[in-house]
């Protein structure tokens, strides 16, 4: 049995949608800082009774930010915190150790941040999420359980089944209800149309009613090959030193995972994520644009932001990332093609994929329009099994750091799987297990639609 240090939750049966995203779920109940007391004093007893009836805020492990949804208005005096780590999910399959470490360590450190801010945290390590909820309710008897809208279809089903009240999420820049306004009576949808609508609606890179620079898109300037010289052109982010929490998490998950151990490439705190954002804006974004579609065997990151893990687990919010990029352009620190190309990835493609997921789930996850039924080749889990240099290079990188940039995912891994007829659900599952920034809402549309054409052209 997997140690209870991992937050992997029992999977639902029957669909990709109902068996993913739960492992990264956490539950928080922000709590009153008044210590539980057994005093016979009437005043103490009243305080204890009031504390016991406080509402619970349920926060998922991909919502690790005080500014998201239900947490945004919570204080130590108004809510209680429950943090659950469950062993049920991880025991069913293997995950990349850097992915497991990133999720677990980020959650533990977020819990520490809440404690430091004055919140009392009921941190439970149990076999299942249901057990954790039952134990928490038995001890604290919350007046209600409320959650920010979960980020996966299965998690929303779970919240509904448990009678949890949900509040609207601000973790994305276009809520599905707003997306319906974009769809309107459109007979067809294109990401570019959505992107322009977003630019206007959010007033990003706009001069009045016109796009800054009189162009919406600078793609023709952003497809240059990498330079043949000057490998130091690509800024290298500093490594973080692993702390005691990191070591404890690694000791707990190592025997149940695959891949190379982390070396400090990925931050696991809000502070670290903000440092990564600052590094990207100051050092990397100025050279991002023209080479954003390039690949190099000798350099795994080039000018990519490496911010997707933090955006996808909540340590960073898209609005602050977009504002930082736009400000850098307005201050003359980065060229327009770099700012526009990066911002398009955030408010365009990312938000578009997010809303397509909610528009088409749950059936979308099972689509296989081409009838692809080839099993995932062994090289995906053991790169030494292939003599194809391009595949081995990318797969070695995934094994080493739980990451490859989007061009490698689409143009190398995705193209191979499409040509070989690999089952799209197996490919989705492998990516979900392997990538540090994996989320069902992004993996399903990108694999089923963008990469494998398993949706028959819907995306």
Located regions from the model:
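Intrinsic-disorder-associated, low-complexity terminal segments enriched in Asp/Asn/His/Tyr and depleted
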Residues: 21, 32-42
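Beta-rich, aromatic/charged-enriched effector core domains that present basic-aromatic interfaces
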Residues: 129-266
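Short beta->alpha junction loops
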Residues: 122-130
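Alpha-helical support elements that line or immediately flank enzyme active sites
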Residues: 413-417
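N-terminal beta-strand-loop-alpha-helix module at the start
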Residues: 52-122
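Acidic, Ala/Val/Gly-enriched low-complexity intrinsically disordered segments
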Residues: 4, 10, 16-17, 42, ...
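Catalytic cores of enzymes that engage adenine nucleotides and/or redox cofactors via long glycine-rich
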Residues: 225-402, 418-419, 430-454
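Cysteine-centered motifs
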Residues: 6, 24, 29-31
């Amino acid at each position: 049995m997997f140690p209870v240090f991992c937050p992997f939750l029992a999977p639902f049966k029957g669909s990709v949608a109902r068996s993913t995203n739960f492992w990264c779920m956490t539950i928080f109940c922000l709590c009153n800082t008044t210590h539980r007391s057994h005093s016979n004093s009437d005043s103490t007893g009243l305080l204890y009774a009031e504390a016991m009836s406080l509402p619970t805020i349920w926060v998922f492990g991909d919502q690790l930010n005080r500014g998201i949804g239900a947490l945004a208005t919570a204080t130590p005096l108004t809510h209680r915190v429950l943090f659950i780590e469950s062993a049920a999910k991880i025991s069913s399959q293997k995950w990349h150790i850097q992915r497991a470490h990133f999720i677990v360590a980020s959650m533990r450190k977020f819990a520490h941040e809440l404690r430091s801010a004055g919140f009392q945290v009921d941190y439970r390590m149990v076999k299942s999420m249901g057990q954790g909820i039952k134990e928490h309710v038995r001890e604290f008897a919350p007046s209600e359980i409320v959650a920010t809208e979960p980020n996966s279809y299965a998690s929303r089903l779970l919240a509904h089944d448990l009678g949890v009240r949900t509040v609207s999420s601000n973790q994305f820049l276009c809520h599905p209800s707003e997306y319906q306004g974009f769809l309107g009576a459109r007979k067809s949808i294109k990401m570019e149309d959505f992107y322009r609508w977003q630019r206007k609606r959010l007033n990003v890179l706009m001069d009045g009613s016109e796009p800054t620079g009189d162009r919406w898109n600078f793609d023709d300037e952003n497809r240059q090959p990498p330079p043949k010289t000057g490998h130091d052109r690509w800024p290298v982010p500093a490594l973080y030193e692993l702390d005691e929490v990191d070591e404890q998490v690694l000791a707990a998950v190592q025997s149940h995972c695959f891949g190379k151990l982390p070396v400090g490439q990925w931050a696991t705190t809000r502070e670290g994520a903000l440092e990564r954002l600052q590094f990207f804006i100051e050092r990397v974004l100025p050279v991002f644009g023209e080479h954003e579609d390039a690949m190099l065997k000798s350099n795994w990151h080039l000018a990519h932001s490496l911010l997707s893990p933090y955006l996808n687990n909540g340590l960073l919010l898209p609005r602050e990332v977009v504002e930082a990029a736009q400000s850098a352009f307005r201050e003359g620190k980065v060229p327009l093609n770099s700012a526009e190309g990066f911002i398009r990835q955030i408010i365009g493609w990312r938000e578009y994929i997010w809303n397509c997921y909610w528009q088409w789930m749950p059936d979308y996850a099972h689509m296989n329009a081409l009838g692809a039924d080839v099993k995932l080749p062994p090289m995906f889990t053991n790169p030494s099994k292939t003599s194809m240099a391009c595949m081995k290079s990318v797969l070695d990188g995934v094994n080493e750091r739980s990451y490859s940039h989007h061009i490698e995912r689409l143009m190398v891994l995705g193209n191979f799987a499409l040509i070989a007829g690999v089952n799209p659900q197996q490919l989705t599952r492998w990516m979900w297990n392997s990538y540090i920034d994996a989320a069902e809402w992004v993996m399903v549309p990108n694999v089923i639609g963008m990469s494998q054409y398993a949706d028959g052209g819907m995306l």
